[in-house]
């Protein structure tokens, strides 16, 4: 019999959202997950599944039953011939990487954070960068889904294909993902090259940058023209690192956090901070080489609020210049660095922000120095207005103000997804406040 805990308080990684579920479960088997769902049906309770808890929104929150998948974290099968790995949905990617290393395999693309679960990263449409690469869910070739009534569906392009196209970005509302099969590639090393540029240069030569580097992204420092360009490409060079505790931590974290805290009293300092830290930390060329997963992932040191929308790739220049013009016209609106700009190939996953179009993701950020919230509403609203104007779609894991009406316009397949959701979960067992805004 599965045991539930009362009095557990859940908080996301950034401590920006939290909840107190009525019961908190940590199942170790499919049968135990089934027991939780049976209990929920019997007591008419809602259920939310949580993984690494990194989503900077309330997508995982509930006052009903919460299932934490951390104890269902095994590698079930490695097929070296097909280069595929099947894992339980609760495995952290950080724990999967060394297992793949043993077999000479790797995932072709990863997000910045690896303390996230296999079931969670596909659920929210996690992405990285690389115009030849899709969001992480495009690497999923099969999955198993436990539905509200206790049925297990085996899903792939050849079995329950329509559910598969929905479940690869499932928002946690179709059922409980039990296993995920990922398409891997042979293990590879990456060289990361970082160098300074300007916003004008990067936007004027965007196609050239995208052709030059397989995994190209750039960081714009608001209230300036400064840009840090980041190329990541296959290499045979031995591992090397430009990491330095003094610059990365003493300056890049401790001093920055202190100055950002001071700027909560003197907001005019933010532009100076952005320019100063670009000059201090990003004004020269740097190179790092390592195994792919050690280059793709990096440590997020700051608690933060973020927004991240995917827009049509061809709208990149227009959107960024409009955001820059808005900040120049409204000097009281301040924006922390960086605005991170990444690029992703289009796909056919029903609620993927990259559905049927190559996309540019534009991530804005406001840090919380020493846990203190910084006024961001004007910046947030101006950004959302620009994103909607250019046809943007918000990252599902990150906070946004969109409703069903917005999503019906944004997603050609939204009604198809809704029909699948209503068929798999007719009573709304897997809904919560966040998802009610999406579907109602």
Swiss-Prot record:
Pfam families, per database record: ALO, FAD_binding_4
Membrane topology: Single-pass membrane protein
PROSITE patterns: FAD_PCMH, OX2_COVAL_FAD
Coiled-coil zones: none
Keyword Cell membrane tagged: no
Pathway per the UniProt entry: Cofactor biosynthesis; L-ascorbate biosynthesis via UDP-alpha-D-glucuronate pathway; L-ascorbate from UDP-alpha-D-glucuronate: step 4/4
GO terms under cellular component: endoplasmic reticulum membrane
CC cofactor: FAD
InterPro entries reported in the protein's UniProt record: ALO_C (IPR007173), FAD-bd_PCMH (IPR016166), FAD-bd_PCMH-like_sf (IPR036318), FAD-bd_PCMH_sub1 (IPR016167), FAD-bd_PCMH_sub2 (IPR016169), FAD_lactone_oxidase-like (IPR010031), Oxid_FAD_bind_N (IPR006094), Oxy_OxRdtase_FAD_BS (IPR006093)
Modified residues (Pros-8alpha-FAD histidine): 54
Superkingdom to which the source organism belongs: Eukaryota
Enzyme Commission no: 1.1.3.8
Domain FAD-binding PCMH-type: 17-187
GO MF annotation list: D-arabinono-1,4-lactone oxidase activity; FAD binding; flavin adenine dinucleotide binding; L-gulonolactone oxidase activity; oxidoreductase activity
Catalyzed reaction equations: L-gulono-1,4-lactone + O2 = L-ascorbate + H2O2 + H(+)
Location (main, coarse): membrane
Subcellular location: Microsome membrane; Endoplasmic reticulum membrane
Membrane-spanning residues: 253-273
Enzyme class, broadest EC rank: oxidoreductase
UniProt record, GO biological process: L-ascorbic acid biosynthetic process
Entries under NCBIfam families matching the protein: bact_FAD_ox, FAD_lactone_ox
Protein purpose: Oxidizes L-gulono-1,4-lactone to hydrogen peroxide and L-xylo-hexulonolactone which spontaneously isomerizes to L-ascorbate.
Family stated for the protein in its record: Belongs to the oxygen-dependent FAD-linked oxidoreductase family.
PANTHER family according to UniProt: L-GULONOLACTONE OXIDASE (PTHR43762:SF8)
Protein name: L-gulonolactone oxidase
Organism in which the protein naturally occurs: Bos taurus (Bovine)
Organism placement in taxonomy: Eukaryota, Metazoa, Chordata, Craniata, Vertebrata
